[in-house]
Each structure stands twice: as structure tokens, then as C-alpha cells.
């Protein structure tokens, strides 16, 4: 959610990478809208990585994220990993770490950042 919010509020960002990205559909409190409602403010391309076993965000939440970005005309690409849950790159936590998903996501995010940032 932090990466999503940064992309919404920092127009100078050239790229946004989201890993796991939960709570995007939940209002921030204090009368502020849910981050998903701010998708139209995102001006940079977005890449996202999600585990299909994650409960926050669920695969259905990720579908909603993609629809919101598409409706806002935001170029984005999401990757999902079977057998991976939340924080699948957290190698110090063996019950979360998914080596195959982690390595694939890392290669993809590096390629994305190289392409977008030059």
C-alpha cells in the first residue's frame, strides 16, 4: 500500500513496484479515501507481484486493483504466484519464503526498473 500511495501522491515517480500490496481497498481513516480510489492520480507504470495464497490481498483484491488501474489508464503488469503467500520474498522466514516466486519476481522487477528508469 505504501508504493501505491507514493505513486498516487508523488507525480515525479517514473515507476512503481508493488510487492504483496495489501489494504489498498481499505480507507486510510480520517476521512481519506481508500488508496484504490486514487488510482487516477498514478502517472507512472506499475508492476506488481502477488501470492495466490495471500489473504491480504486476496487474488480477488488483485483483480480489483488491476481493474482500477485499467479504468484509470495506468499501464501496469501484475504477476501472481501459485503456492506463494504474503511476503514470499522474506527469506529469513522459511514459512513465508517461496524461492521460485522470489527469484522470478526479482528478475522481473529489475528488468522493469531498467526499462523504465533507463
Predicted segments, located by residue:
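Primarily recognizes the serine-hydrolase "nucleophile elbow" in alpha/beta-hydrolase
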Residues: 1-41
Amino acid at each position: 500500500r505504501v508504493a501505491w500511495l507514493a505513486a498516487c501522491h508523488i507525480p515525479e515517480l517514473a515507476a512503481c513496484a508493488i510487492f504483496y500490496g495489501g489494504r489498498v481497498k481499505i480507507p486510510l481513516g480520517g476521512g481519506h479515501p481508500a488508496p484504490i480510489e486514487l488510482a487516477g492520480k498514478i502517472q507512472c507504470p506499475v508492476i506488481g507481484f502477488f501470492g495466490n495464497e495471500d489473504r491480504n490481498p486476496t487474488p480477488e483484491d488483485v483483480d480489483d486493483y488491476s481493474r482500477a488501474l485499467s479504468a484509470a489508464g495506468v499501464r501496469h503488469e501484475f504477476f501472481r504466484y501459485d503456492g506463494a503467500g504474503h511476503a514470499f520474498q522474506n527469506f529469513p522466514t522459511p514459512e513465508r519464503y517461496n524461492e521460485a516466486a522470489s527469484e522470478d519476481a526479482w528478475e522481473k522487477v529489475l528488468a522493469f526498473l531498467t526499462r523504465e528508469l533507463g
